[in-house]
Structure formats: structure tokens, C-alpha cells
Amino acid sequence: MGAIERNGYIFEPEYSVISQDGAIHVYKEGKFVEEIKFEFQGKFPEHNQIEELVNHYCAQFHQ
């Protein structure tokens, strides 16, 4: 799963299958902004879950 670019931000997801959690690191202009934590089930998070988190971030905090 690669980085997602949206609204001037870069979202880089990473996750741990063992602990069943992950985080999306948010960057703007190359600088770290914040971390969005999430949980998932299965072997990896579904792409739709990541997209929903990114969409929510963009809609709620940085229009």
C-alpha cells in the first residue's frame, strides 16, 4: 500500500499484522503533521478503510 496524495497532503500508511493496528502518517510540504491511528482485522487493512480515514481527515480538518 503506497502513499496517497490529497489536498496538498501526503498520507503514508503503515501497519502491523501481529498487533492488528496501524497508523497513517500525514505530511505537508515534506513536514510531518500528525499520525492517524487505526485498527483492522485480517492479514492487512482494506484499501477502502485507509481511503475513508484519509477522506475524513481532509473533510473534517483541512478543507
What are these model-derived regions, one by one?
Residues K31-Q63:
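Mixed-charge, Lys/Arg-enriched low-complexity segments
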